Amino acid sequence: PDRAIARLSIDRLLIVKDEEAYCQPCVSPVWDTALTAHTMLEAGGERAKAAAKAGLDWLVPLQVLDVKGDWAEQRPEVRPGGWAFQYNNAHYPDLDDTAVVAMAMDRAQGNTSSHEFDPALARAREWVLGLQSRNGGWAAFDADNTYSYLNNIPFSDHGALLDPPTEDVTARCISMLA
């Protein structure tokens, strides 16, 4: 049974079509919806704007407002306010998705008199500002997780124990705050 369950789990990662097959180890509905909203807003037109708004409305209740995840270990005083990459991962919202979602919401209501996304935007801003690392940058999930000695642990050969600030996440956070 354990082997059968493991095999079924692996098989569910595979997407097999007539002309191609690929592995999709995770789904990214929040990220995909936010990027699609940006695309629709860029395209313009009433149908595209309505589609973007529908996607953003879907994202509003996915904002993590009441769960302090691992990030709170470094920043216990910061209130939650981010979005996770997946459908439901309240303990691990990430700054990258949060910045992209917030920018799309701000953009969607920017040319209107609507303020319906203001509460979500305020919490996102608060959370992003609260997780800025001491060196001025932002990481994906945490603040000040730069302890490189962790990479010397034998089982950490893939280097996933750290979450240092990166240029791309920092750029998106700065863009969101601008």
Regions found by a protein language model. Name each.
Residues P1-A178:
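Preference for long, amphipathic alpha-helical scaffolds in soluble/luminal domains
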